[in-house]
């Protein structure tokens, strides 16, 4: 597995739900992090029996000059877009899916890839009723952009998967809804070992891994997100899984260590081959 940086985004205090700025400052300062948070955006590349697999595809041109770096880093890893066989989406928010298409032509950037996503996730973003019920910003940035990115793959290059389904050899969808209705993590099994790519289980690990009850202002169902985060963190810790996170600081690999009533991420040692 290779970590690929899509860059980072600067966020404000308002990304947190019911969490005060001074609390953010205090928790970020413990790890010598800037506050308000700077959030890494990562994607992950797998090469193995299932072919060349990309997990999430970054933000394209949607998030400004500090993000959208996936393609130059994919090239640095020696992979051309047309060589990618499968793209696994954790969910359809812009920083995870807006690298699917060419921003000028609207065509697929991964000409030979099949996109695999949770059925619930795709059905939500293609629900006209849900779109009409959303505010104007969400209609554009979430529903509109999700459809813009996924549409070119609906001609036979989109596969809808279910919770618990082994979508490729050794890769299983583990649903962890709340952040979005079909937010998914990907459980990887190889040679008797497991690791999990946890998507947006934690946007700011310094806070949400230590305090799993803290949700984000843009969570679809904040309470569900907090419950599922709490449960999945406990499972990861109990099973001592290596984790890969889209918003763990690059390269994004780590282990959970118990700290008080929560956890912290112990960053995996740097390794050119993981």
Please give the residue ranges for each predicted region.
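Metal-dependent catalytic neighborhoods of phosphoester/phosphodiester hydrolases
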Residues: 69-72, 98-106, 255-256
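Core dinuclear metal-dependent hydrolase active-site scaffold
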Residues: 1-8, 43-47, 53, 160-191
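Active-site metal-binding loops of divalent metal-dependent hydrolases
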Residues: 6-8, 57-60, 92, 120-121, ...
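Short acidic/His/Gly/Ser-rich catalytic and metal-binding motifs that mark active-site loops
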Residues: 63, 124-127, 205-209
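Cap/insert and terminal regions of metallo-dependent hydrolase folds
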Residues: 68, 187, 191-274
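Metallo-beta-lactamase
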Residues: 1-79, 83-97, 109-175, 192-200, ...
């Amino acid at each position: 597995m290779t970590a690929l940086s899509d860059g980072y985004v600067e966020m404000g205090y308002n990304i947190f739900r019911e969490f005060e700025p001074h609390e953010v400052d205090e928790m970020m300062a413990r790890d010598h992090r800037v506050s308000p948070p700077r959030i890494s955006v990562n994607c992950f590349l797998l090469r193995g029996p299932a072919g060349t697999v990309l997990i999430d595809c970054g933000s394209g041109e949607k998030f400004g000059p500090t993000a959208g770096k996936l393609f130059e880093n994919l090239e640095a890893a020696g992979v051309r877009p047309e060589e990618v066989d499968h793209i696994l989406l954790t969910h359809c928010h812009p920083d995870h899916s807006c690298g699917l298409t060419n921003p000028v032509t609207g065509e697929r950037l991964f000409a030979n890839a099949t996109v695999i996503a949770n059925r619930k996730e795709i059905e939500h973003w293609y629900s006209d009723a849900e779109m009409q019920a959303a505010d104007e910003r969400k209609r554009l940035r979430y529903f509109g952009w999700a459809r813009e990115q996924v549409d070119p793959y609906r001609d036979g290059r989109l596969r809808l998967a279910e919770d618990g389904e082994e979508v490729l050899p050794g890769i299983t969808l583990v649903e962890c809804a709340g952040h979005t209705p079909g937010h998914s993590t990907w459980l990887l099994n190889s040679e008797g070992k497991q690791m999990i790519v946890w998507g947006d289980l934690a946007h700011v690990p310094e806070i949400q891994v230590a305090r799993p009850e803290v949700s984000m202002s843009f969570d679809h169902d904040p309470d569900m997100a907090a419950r599922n985060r709490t449960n999945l963190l406990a499972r990861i810790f109990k099973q001592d899984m290596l984790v890969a996170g889209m918003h763990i600081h690059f390269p994004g690999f780590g282990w959970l260590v118990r700290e008080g009533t929560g956890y912290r991420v112990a960053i995996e040692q740097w390794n050119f081959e993981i």
